[in-house]
Amino acid sequence: MVSVALAQPVSSLATMLAYYGEPGTSSWDEEAHAGPGRCPHCATALVQRQRAVVNSIAPRTQQTKKRNVAIFIHNGVEVLDFAGPSEVFAATQGFNVYTVSLTKEPIISQAFIRVLLNYSLTDCPPPDILVLPGGQTGPFLENEPLISWIKRCAQSAEVILSVCTGAGLLGKAGLLDGLQATTFHNYIEPLQKANPRARILRHTRFVDNGQIITTAGVWAGIDGALHVVAKLKGQAVATQTARYMEYDKWKPNEGLVVDMVGKPASKKD
């Protein structure tokens, strides 16, 4: 077995010459490293080259603060609903991704996988982006501490992204009123019935209302997360992340971006 050293990122350099990943191989290919080896994020080989842009190797104190991405998971959660968006944000620079649940006790997913938690509702860092995956969501719709926490997050979060039946939690928190939304195809009618003030759409990969973004089922969570990346960091970064993940199903135009009059677009980094 070959042992490969993972290079350490450079916090600041006096010259522009350093070691980088091959251009276009991942979203980390512009992070500078002091020596050869492999990228600690994506394991691509590092090559020595000169960069024309300085700010990516500026001291950490000068770099843009990472956005907190809280992935709420619960017993019976659909694995791909949370694993897909988690991978998107973790594979893109500028995001701090962590899991949160009602407590710190391990949960069992819909596919019988045991998942460990980073935080509970009581000690979770305030999220800039909150992801609400689906699965067996029904038992949690009446959980008052959870619904109250989602409402509090909505007061300060930049984006709340629901995947699949996770839209039910948004509805229970009153966050779908007056909006267009989508969800898992088998959940469209129940969600519409429970949220008469919302318009639940079929055959739509994701719906962006500004702060509130909903997606269809399972795989569509990846599309929704990539859309959030494009919205916050630009289309080129999202495309690069999709390429790194070898996710060739993403078609940005399959989603609906609602024109929210009077609501400014999110600022890109």
Q: Which residue ranges define each predicted feature?
A:
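A short glycine-threonine-serine/GTX helix/turn-capping micro-motif
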Residues: G210-G217
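Short functional micro-motifs and their immediate structural scaffolds
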Residues: A32, L46-V47
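The −1 position to Zn-ligating cysteines in a subset of zinc-ribbon hairpins
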Residues: R38
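Short beta-strand scaffold positions
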Residues: S162, T182-T183
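Extended, subdomain-level signal for the structured scaffold at the beginning of enzyme domains
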Residues: V2-Y20, V47-I160, A167-K172, G178, ...
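Short metal-coordination and nucleic-acid-contact micro-motifs, chiefly zinc-binding Cys/His arrays
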Residues: G35
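Cys/His-coordinated zinc-binding microdomains
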Residues: T25-D29, A43
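Class I SAM-dependent methyltransferase SAM-binding "motif I" and its flanking Rossmann-like core
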Residues: T183-H185, E189
